[in-house]
Amino acid sequence: MPVNAIASSNNKCVDNFNFLRQSSSDRYQKYSQDYIKIGNGYTFLNTNKNIMGSDAKEVYTMKLDMKLDSLCNKVDYAGYQVIKDKMQSLQGI
C-alpha cells in the first residue's frame, strides 16, 4: 500500500507544526495564530533594528526568542499527545 510521505522541512518546529496540521489537532489553529504574532514581532524588529536602542533591541530579541522556543515546545508536546491518543485507540486490538 503506497503512502505519500510528507517531506521534512529540516526545521523541527516547522515539521511539528506540519504534523499537528496533518493530524487535524484542535490546537493547530491557536498555535498557528501565536506563530504569526511572533513572526510579526520579528518583522517589527528587523524593520526597526537600526533605530532602536541596543538595550531595547536585545531585550525584545530575547523575548521573541523565548516566545518562539516556548511555542515550539508546546507544538512538540501537542504532537506527542496526538501519538499518545493514536496508541490508546489501538489498545482493544
Which positions does each model-derived feature cover?
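Immediate post-signal-peptide N-terminus of mature secreted/exported proteins
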Residues: M1-D26
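Compact alpha-helical subdomains of small soluble proteins
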Residues: I36-I93
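Charge-rich, solvent-exposed alpha-helical interaction surfaces
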Residues: N16-F19, D34, K67
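Surface-exposed patches in mature extracellular/periplasmic domains of secreted proteins
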Residues: S25-Q33, G79
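Short, solvent-exposed segments of well-ordered alpha helices
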Residues: N4, Q22, Q29, D55, ...
